[in-house]
A protein has these predicted regions:
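A glycine-rich, often tryptophan-bearing local segment used as a flexible ligand/cofactor-contacting loop or short
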Residues: 53-133, 178
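A structural signal for short, well-ordered beta-strand segments and their strand-loop junctions
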Residues: 27-30, 76, 82-85, 167-168
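Short, flexible loop segments at the rims of nucleotide/cofactor-binding pockets, characterized by
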Residues: 23-27, 57-61, 143-147
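Aromatic-Pro/Gly-enriched surface loop or interdomain linker
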Residues: 1-45
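Structural motif
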Residues: 44-54, 82-83, 165-169
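Alpha-helical scaffolding within the catalytic cores
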Residues: 31-35, 66, 150-154
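A glycine-centered loop/beta-turn motif at secondary-structure junctions
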Residues: 2-3, 21-22, 80, 139-191
């Protein structure tokens, strides 16, 4: 089964190539494309990388807010969404998601327990769970905590309609197994 991921950022990154190396076709979706009503693509998964909320790294947050209903509809119709850490202490960094999430930016390695969800747990299977770089925690959210540190949630899962949203503050590339499984489990959905 072939699958297509949309990688949302201003320019190509190493992450794009990593996604392709995992056997997933990857399309760069710039902030202008994301917010443009005429942009259409068929995707299984949309990936929002670390730093999306920090204006020192990109100008993505306004486009995510402008596209929030479109993103929600994409997930409701069967697409999957993978969101990483905002990389800034902003109470409203995740206000574009269809459920409340509060993020506390704090970079350092953490011990993570991902035993509650086999799919989400595979995100870190290439790393030592005793020492994984994270850029924060999610002290409050309306999802299921699928990965926790002693300080709070690191991985959140939420099913919306036929799709799934995973929010994580893990500051590493997801495992190849996770990326292939998560992207291909989403339905090919118009975005």
């Amino acid at each position: 089964m072939s699958c297509r991921a949309g990688f949302v950022w201003e320019s190509p990154q190493h992450f794009n190539r990593y996604i392709e190396d995992c056997g997933v076709s990857c399309e760069l979706v710039t902030p202008h494309m994301l917010a443009a009503p005429f942009f259409r693509s068929m995707l299984n998964c949309l990936i929002i990388p670390t730093g999306f909320g920090n204006p020192a790294y990109c100008r993505l947050l306004p486009a995510l807010r402008a596209s929030s209903k479109r993103i929600e509809k994409f997930v409701e119709n069967g697409g999957n969404l993978l969101v990483f850490g905002a990389a800034i202490n902003r109470a409203d960094a995740y206000d574009w998601l269809p459920f409340p999430v509060t993020y506390h930016h704090d970079c350092h390695p953490r011990r993570i327990d991902c035993s509650l969800s086999p799919v989400t747990g595979s995100l870190v299977e290439d790393y030592d769970p005793e020492n994984i770089e994270c850029d924060g925690i999610f002290p409050m959210h309306e999802g299921d905590a699928a990965g926790n540190s002693s300080e709070g949630a690191i991985l959140i899962e939420k099913t919306i309609g036929k799709g799934k949203i995973i929010v994580t503050s893990i500051h590493e590339f997801p495992s190849r197994t996770f990326l292939k499984t998560f992207c291909s489990s989403g339905e090919l959905t118009p975005f």
